[in-house]
């Protein structure tokens, strides 16, 4: 499994940037995606995939310790849908 540091190292090697500059670039991309999603906007990266905010409806839940039924409020969650090129690369 790759982590953020592995991603930074890969970006540094591919772009000939320093690891410090690569880390700044990776952080900037993550921050931009987060900012767009927090505003409810979709981020579409052709060939890679789409990041979007999906709404979860309110639903009934159950406390596993007591078995008591409870209401879970509606919420918004980030979601990612892989694009065709990414799906094909994974096959």
Swiss-Prot record:
Q: Which GO terms describe its biological process?
A: chromosome condensation
Name listed for the protein in its UniProt record? DNA-binding protein HU
Q: Where are the transmembrane segments?
A: none
Q: Which gene encodes it?
A: hup
Cite the GO molecular-function annotations of the record: DNA binding; structural constituent of chromatin
Q: Which UniProt keywords apply?
A: DNA condensation, DNA-binding, Virulence
Asked if the record carries the keyword DNA-binding, the reply is yes
Which segments does the entry list as coiled coil? none
- Which Pfam family, an example, fits this chain? Bac_DNA_binding
């Amino acid at each position: 499994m790759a982590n953020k540091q592995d991603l930074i190292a890969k970006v540094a090697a591919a772009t000939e940037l320093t690891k410090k500059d690569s880390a700044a670039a990776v952080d900037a991309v993550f921050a931009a995606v987060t900012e767009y999603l927090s505003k409810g906007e979709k981020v579409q990266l052709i060939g890679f995939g789409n990041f979007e905010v999906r709404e979860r409806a309110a639903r009934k839940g159950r406390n596993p310790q007591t078995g008591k039924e409870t209401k879970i409020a509606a919420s918004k969650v980030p979601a990612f849908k892989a694009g065709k090129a990414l799906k094909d690369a994974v096959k």
